[in-house]
Curated annotation (Swiss-Prot):
This is Inner membrane protein YabI. Disulfide bonds: none annotated. GO terms for biological process: FtsZ-dependent cytokinesis; response to ionizing radiation. It comes from Escherichia coli (strain K12). The gene is yabI. The chain crosses the membrane at residues 8-28, 29-49, 59-79, 145-165, 179-199, 216-236. The keyword Iron-sulfur does not apply.
Length: 254
């Protein structure tokens, strides 16, 4: 899939933007997004943006269009086929996730639609479930548009950072900088994830809860987060940081 996307992009800008629309659309489409490695594909497209092969602003607009198309078709499918969907064996097997999504939409519909756009398992479900619950369009449209405006750059970002790092001129410190950038990103991401696990420690009932008990999270979370912050400070003070920032500015056209 990644090789196919790269082939399209080298052939035409139009093909590249069509690829962005397609990935964003399928990632947002009801249930399809559960099996599509959309996060990886969006990061791959982000790497092409970071390397200058694809316009950031054009890709952002294409991502918004694909996202809105997928969400609104999902909403319509949920509204139109709500009864058959409730009887579908696939949804019966994932009834717990469906029930949680329905409960969240009943309690905090706008917040759930907005935040659900950024959470992998719920992203392709929330619009469909909102349609199944006959949620008024007026309640769906505002958080959905906001989410679709913010989602593409958020998912492009890891790839953009990696693609821009590739363009750093080769030198004695370029390898060191790239490894430091990777380590910083990993520690900050893991630290953020652990913060989320700690916040949900009283509610989480998955397999990881056995290994990441609240007591363990209370010391592991600040440790990993502190390492990430220290790595970020070292990264910011690295001699190649101005070069990297200049590349990123060119990518976004600032």
């Amino acid at each position: 899939m990644q090789a196919l996307l790269e082939h399209f992009i080298t052939q035409s800008t139009v093909y590249s933007l069509m690829a962005v629309v397609l990935v964003a659309f399928l990632e947002s489409l009801a249930l399809v997004g559960l099996i599509l490695p959309g996060t990886v594909l969006m990061a791959g497209l982000g790497a092409l943006i970071g390397s200058g092969e694809l316009s950031f602003w054009h890709a952002w607009l294409a991502g918004i269009i694909g996202c809105l198309m997928g969400d609104w078709i999902s909403f319509w499918l949920g509204w139109r086929f709500k009864k058959p969907l409730h009887r579908w064996s696939f949804l019966k097997k994932n009834k717990a996730l469906l029930d949680k999504t329905e409960h969240a939409l009943h309690q905090h519909s706008m917040f759930t639609i907005l935040v659900g756009r950024f959470v992998g398992p719920t992203r392709p479900l929330v619009p469909m479930v909102a349609g199944m619950l006959d949620l008024p369009v007026a309640k769906f449209i505002t958080p959905n548009i906001i989410g679709c405006l913010l989602w593409p750059p958020f998912y492009f970002l890891p790839g953009i950072l990696a693609g821009a790092a590739i363009d750093i001129p080769a030198g004695m410190q370029s390898g060191e900088f790239k490894w430091l950038l990777l380590a910083t990103a990993v520690f900050l991401w893991v630290g953020g994830w652990l913060c989320w696990r700690l916040w949900r420690s009283g509610k989480a009932t998955d397999r990881l809860s056995h290994y990441l008990s609240r007591g363990r999270l209370l010391w592991l979370t600040p440790l990993i987060s502190a390492i990430g912050v220290v790595a970020l400070v070292v990264l910011i003070r690295h001699p190649l940081m101005p070069v990297y920032i200049d590349i990123l500015r060119k990518v976004v056209g600032v």
